[in-house]
Design a protein with these regions (language model features):
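Start-of-domain marker
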Residues: 1-36
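Short coil/turn connectors between adjacent alpha-helices in alpha-solenoid helical repeat scaffolds
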Residues: 2-8, 41-61, 90-101, 132-143, ...
């Protein structure tokens, strides 16, 4: 799956998610992480000019992801429910289904308080700050969170995680953008 991420073959992720039997799978948390990534991808694609036909799929994927997050709420690692629901609100905002920017940021911040050493949570919050409008975030602030996440990504369990690679990419992008400020 990491190779598919590197090659930007997101249809591989879609096929994996679609073929997984979420309700009975021991890999529910892994599938949820892929759904989180795929939703971000498909929402971004649907917003591109000439790709409006993807909008129904994007909306359906976000709702499906939201239902999985809600169903697993009590079983998710500390801070992950808040992280994933924050992402849902961002996706819905991008799809113009509802406006939740403050609720999204609030949940992302809450996730960092609940799980201050969880690299997924820290990286997600960095992503929120990276894309947030000036009053709510900055590349400089995002970089701090990405670098903090990177410290916790150092174990073997994260070696092949797509979020770790995305985190490293964001560190580079932040440093590049800050160089020109």
């Amino acid at each position: 799956m990491l190779d598919a991420y590197r090659r930007e073959e997101m249809n591989t992720w879609r096929d994996y998610i679609d073929s997984a039997r979420f309700e009975i799978s021991d890999l529910r948390f892994q599938i949820l992480l892929y759904e989180y990534g795929y939703c971000g991808y498909i929402v971004a694609e649907a917003k591109k000019e000439g790709k409006e036909a993807l909008m129904p799929e994007a909306k359906a994927r976000v709702q499906h992801f939201k239902s999985h997050v809600t169903r697993l709420a009590s079983q998710l690692p500390v801070g992950h429910y808040e992280m994933y629901m924050s992402a849902v609100y961002v996706y819905e905002l991008r799809l113009h289904e509802s406006i939740h920017p403050m609720k999204s940021m609030s949940l992302a911040k809450e996730a960092t308080k609940l799980a201050p050493q969880d690299p997924l949570v820290l990286s997600y919050y960095g992503t929120c700050l990276f894309y947030a409008p000036k009053p709510f975030g900055s590349k400089e602030e995002a970089l701090k969170w990405f670098e903090k996440a990177e410290k916790y990504f150092e174990g073997d369990e994260w070696r092949y995680c797509w979020v770790r690679e995305a985190n490293q990419m964001y560190i580079g992008q932040c440093k590049e953008k800050l160089k020109y400020l």
